[in-house]
């Protein structure tokens, strides 16, 4: 098939993997210098929305690739790959306007839409008096469709959404019309038929639908969101105050990220997959499971130089919803502090099988080898 270019502020690993599987090129357009910036004293007065799309890069990429080769523009809220950082309403509006200027659908990966709305409410001018639901309504007003895993801001054990705006840019670009402009193939109906024939009629039991009906409203509760984001910030500040290098500040909406290049003082090369070594030692020594979302998961070694520059070599500490106490977080802070002191002993990792498998971090095997 055709090699399309699909720009985003940050494709998540599975999204990027699926784009590559269909023979197209994912691009992540964000401000890496801003992301790694450490504020004076560890805190910003207002969140700088480090998850924003770099709109200058977006327009330049569309012009370089040609609008006909860009089937959609994709924005992830919050930006999981870019350390869970939020996207401002102004940036959503601007990114959508650029996409529409070239007749391109603007899509959202909205798995963490409520957390993003919380950051807008508490940091962006003009939104302090608006409810989470009102802010969400405006966020979604700028897109032509969205995907969302509802195990995140749906507060449910399963479920997801693929939604398209009626008569939006996606519908116009991917439906078929006759000479008089009448619809001959409606892409929405086509996708629904494919979904039913592949997965059954929505595939949910009544229990799951009821959980989602409650969960989507629960996620709009301001005090719940405030507690969740505060836990993330508490963990990040605990790492920072203990002198651990590489902590991304401020914390995102669902977790804390550590830049492995900084953590290891720039001494580990990309092919060492040291973030995986960090993850291995943290669970082996202290029973704490984290996710490497850097050189290994994002397949740094298989990318072009311009794509490599868009990789954040990080490890993610995702915070369980409404489960952890301050004592849990204090234990994590203490454990990572001890591991940081002994970071020279953390092994490197090599792939022993499945190096070129699609989405290899789900399938491949690794083994540790000593750091020398």
Residue ranges of predicted features:
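Conserved PLP-enzyme active-site core in the AAT-like
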Residues: 1-244, 269
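Glycine-rich beta-alpha junction loops
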Residues: 77-79, 112, 152-154, 252-254, ...
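Short, conserved charged micro-motifs
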Residues: 78, 265-274, 322-331
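PLP-dependent enzyme catalytic core of the Aspartate aminotransferase-like
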Residues: 219, 285, 297-372
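Extracellular structured ligand-interaction cores
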Residues: 159, 253, 314
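Short beta-strand-to-loop capping motifs
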Residues: 164, 258-261, 319-321
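Conserved small-domain helix->loop->beta segment predominantly found in fold-type I
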Residues: 200, 204-280, 284-311, 347-357
């Amino acid at each position: 098939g055709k090699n399309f270019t699909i720009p985003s502020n940050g494709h998540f690993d599975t999204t990027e993997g699926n784009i590559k599987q269909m023979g197209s090129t994912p691009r992540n357009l964000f401000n890496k210098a801003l992301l790694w910036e450490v504020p004076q004293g560890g805190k910003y007065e207002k969140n700088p929305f480090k998850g924003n799309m770099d709109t200058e890069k977006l327009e330049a990429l569309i012009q370089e690739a040609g609008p006909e080769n860009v089937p959609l523009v994709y924005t992830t809220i919050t930006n999981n790959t870019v350390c869970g950082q939020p996207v401002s309403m102004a940036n959503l509006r601007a990114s959508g306007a650029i996409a529409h200027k070239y007749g391109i659908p603007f899509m959202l990966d909205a798995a963490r839409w409520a957390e993003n709305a919380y950051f807008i409410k508490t940091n962006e001018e003009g939104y302090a008096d608006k409810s989470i639901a009102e802010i969400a309504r405006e966020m979604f007003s700028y897109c032509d469709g969205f995907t969302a895993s509802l195990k995140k801001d749906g507060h449910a054990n399963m479920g997801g959404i693929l939604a398209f705006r009626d008569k939006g840019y996606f519908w116009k670009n991917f439906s078929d019309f006759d000479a008089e402009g009448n619809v001959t193939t409606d892409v929405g109906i086509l996708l629904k038929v494919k979904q039913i024939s592949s997965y059954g009629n929505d595939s949910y039991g009544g229990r799951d639908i009821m959980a989602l009906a409650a969960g989507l409203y629960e996620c709009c509760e301001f005090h719940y969101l405030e507690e969740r984001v505060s836990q993330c910030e508490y963990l990040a500040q605990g790492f920072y105050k203990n002198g651990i290098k590489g902590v991304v500040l401020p914390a995102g909406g669902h977790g804390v990220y550590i830049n492995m290049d900084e953590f290891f003082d720039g001494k580990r090369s990309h092919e060492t997959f040291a973030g995986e070594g960090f993850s291995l030692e943290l669970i082996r020594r202290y029973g704490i499971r984290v996710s490497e979302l850097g050189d290994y998961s994002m397949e740094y070694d298989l990318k072009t130089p311009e794509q490599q520059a868009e990789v954040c070599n990080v490890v993610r500490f995702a915070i369980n919803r409404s489960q952890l106490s301050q004592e849990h977080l204090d234990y994590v802070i203490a454990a990572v502090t001890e591991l940081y002191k002994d970071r020279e002993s953390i092994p490197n990792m090599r792939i022993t099988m499945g190096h070129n498998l699609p989405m290899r971090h789900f399938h491949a095997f690794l083994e540790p080898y000593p750091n020398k």
